[in-house]
UniProtKB/Swiss-Prot annotation:
This is UPF0178 protein PFLU_5917. Belongs to the UPF0178 family. InterPro entries: UPF0178 (IPR003791). It comes from the Bacteria. It comes from Pseudomonas fluorescens (strain SBW25).
């Protein structure tokens, strides 16, 4: 079992939660980043820094993650590519990406992108608070249990 993390955009709290689960459940965590990151010093965690470039980390994740593995990402177009490949994807707020919700998630993402470009809306998502941390931990537990049963 392996959990991949799009490390450049993932909140530290979510990364830490995945590592905590990995230590308990004995699986590998792979952080994929476009820039150097601080890697937790556990043998179950690997860091892969990809060459810089647009979507380099995304492309790496799509090429290397396989069905039965989980990718943590907040990038909706990346999640769409992963889900189309049969890979499970979860955002750091605890919402699972699925074939059933991808078109809606892409439409919302595109709407917010358009509104930001028109200056009608501010930057990124709200802060990653306790509610989001708990929702992520619950979803992570549920998905890991499901994937480990399927293995």
């Amino acid at each position: 079992m392996r959990v991949w993390i799009d490390a450049d955009a993932c909140p530290r709290a979510a990364k830490d939660q995945v590592v905590k689960f990995a230590l308990k459940r004995q699986f590998e965590v792979v952080l994929v980043a476009g820039q150097s990151q601080i890697k937790p010093s556990f043998s179950c965690v690997k860091l892969i820094v990809v060459p810089s470039g647009p979507d380099a980390a995304d492309d790496y994740l799509v090429e290397h993650a396989v069905p039965g593995e989980l990718v943590i990402c907040s990038d909706v177009p990346l999640a769409d590519r992963l889900v189309k490949n049969g890979v499970t994807a979860l955002d750091p707020r605890g919402k699972e990406f699925s074939p059933a919700n991808m078109s809606e998630r892409l439409a919302v993402r595109n709407l917010f992108t358009d509104l930001r470009e028109q200056g009608q809306m501010g930057g990124g998502p709200p802060p990653h608070g306790e509610k989001e941390k708990q929702a992520f931990a619950n979803a992570l537990d549920r998905i890991l249990t499901r994937l480990m049963r399927q293995a």
